[in-house]
Amino acid sequence: MTVTDTAASRLSRLKAHADLLAQSLRGIEKEGLRVDAQGKLAVTPHPSGLGSALTNEHVTTDYSEALLELITGTHGRVEPLLAELENTHRFVYSVLDGEYIWNQSMPATLPPEADIPIAWYGRSNTGMLKHVYRRGLAERYGKAMQCIAGVHYNFSLPDALWEILDPGAADPQTRRSRGYIGLIRNFTRYSWLLMYLFGAAPALSRSFMGDRPHPLQALDADTLYLPHATSLRMSDLGYQNNKAQAQLKLCYNDLDTFLARLYGAVTQPWPEYQAIGTHRDGQWIQLNTNVLQIENEYYSSIRPKRATGRCERPVTALAERGVQYVEVRCLDIDPQQPVGIAADTARFVDAFLLFCAVSDSPYFPQNGYCQRSADNFSVVVKEGRKPGLMLDRDGVAISLPDWGRELLDHIAPYAALYDQALGGDAYARALQAQHAKLGHADDTPSARLLAELRDQGVPFHEYSLQLSRRHADALRAQPLPADVAAGYAEAARQSHAEQARLEQSDDVDFDTYVARYQAALKAPGSR
């Protein structure tokens, strides 16, 4: 975009081509722990009826063998997106026997660390790489933190829209990547608002913290919380408390610098990890001793993404073909929704991301990192509902409700454009529903959860188990149509066959495969 171009002029151009917004795409990856009837982490293998966790495109596992990940395709509207997510939940429940999907971001009752099962993907080199990477996560961060779950929201805008927003770019790939990186800068500035409006993890089971020191208070004998927290999941209880991750400050001023720093993190040894080593008792325990084993280890609330081929590294794919979409990673599971996310939340996120894409997005002056934005985010996840809370907007203090209302006013035209493109007024209503939360913090999901714990007089674990059972009953009461069920079953069958094919086609040992995978990483800018 030109130096004299403004958000107002870009919005004006967008209004003339609002129909292009119908080509926006969104997809969801929703995590959820399998638990037994008592709400304890399931220690059973990934059910065979769900297919291969390595190759089934609908259902896989994340860190633990018990941490399900339900994946949708991409959709042009929210309604079919959530319909697919609901169908996948129904399919999973048609297979689960005496188990439930834990419908909270903060984990169920966990066994001792040694007994938390790491996800297993079979004996192919591809599967073993995923498994060993997870062994490394256990060494670096502990297993309990890896059992935290969330909703990842993938979002893209059509190339024709980027051309309207940035007509002066040299080529479509540069334009698209520049646009998404600008979106990410604004997301970094304003994502505290998402945590206030949708954060739903202010409490957790005491057992989760174990013997670790923490700032949490006791709500009851079994529940820890912070009185004004919105999302303990996104607080410094986890990755951000890790020294290697904490010192890693990537640059969001341009894609090339972002990739150069990410490349540095996956190639630079870290002393503590060197002390651990890559092998113990003849077994691989981490892929390497670098700051990050692979790119996906980097902890962030949003990522630039590009689909990769087999054995292709994300840094290489992004460097060669540019950003394809963004992955929003800060959404907590909505415990009131059977599928973990409400339609209004998805619509608001769409409008919010479009606002981030079109609004002015100055470079971050601190070498491409914005400490002020990180501080705002951190304070909101831990005390976002605190009366009189002030945030830092460009060095000037402003109250959270005042800034939030201003942002909603700025987002409103983008919600209206989605309604214009898709018909109806669902986006405007989704945005309007958020105003009440800024005027009344008790209306936020985090406040409602704490109020229900107090009103019902039950600990977090019991409350969450009751809710998860209720959602399971509702989903099981509406079985899939026969043809849809058959489609899921066939995908599961084919995934087992594909895993077997991969295991039979390996022509090198695992050590060689890991070396090749590391060698596939190209420095950005190299050919």
UniProtKB/Swiss-Prot annotation:
EC top class named in words: ligase
GO molecular function: ATP binding; glutamate-cysteine ligase activity; metal ion binding
GO cellular component terms given for this protein: cytosol
Catalytic activity: L-cysteine + L-glutamate + ATP = gamma-L-glutamyl-L-cysteine + ADP + phosphate + H(+)
EC number: 6.3.2.2
Keywords from the UniProt entry: ATP-binding, Glutathione biosynthesis, Ligase, Nucleotide-binding
Residues annotated as signal peptide: none
Pathway annotation: Sulfur metabolism; glutathione biosynthesis; glutathione from L-cysteine and L-glutamate: step 1/2
Record GO biological process: glutathione biosynthetic process
UniProt-listed InterPro entries: Gln_synth/guanido_kin_cat_dom, Glu_cys_ligase, Glut_cys_ligase
Pfam families in alphabetical order: Glu_cys_ligase
Family according to the record: Belongs to the glutamate--cysteine ligase type 1 family. Type 1 subfamily.
PANTHER family: GLUTAMATE--CYSTEINE LIGASE
Name listed for the protein in its UniProt record: Glutamate--cysteine ligase
Organism: Bordetella petrii (strain ATCC BAA-461 / DSM 12804 / CCUG 43448)
Gene behind the chain: gshA
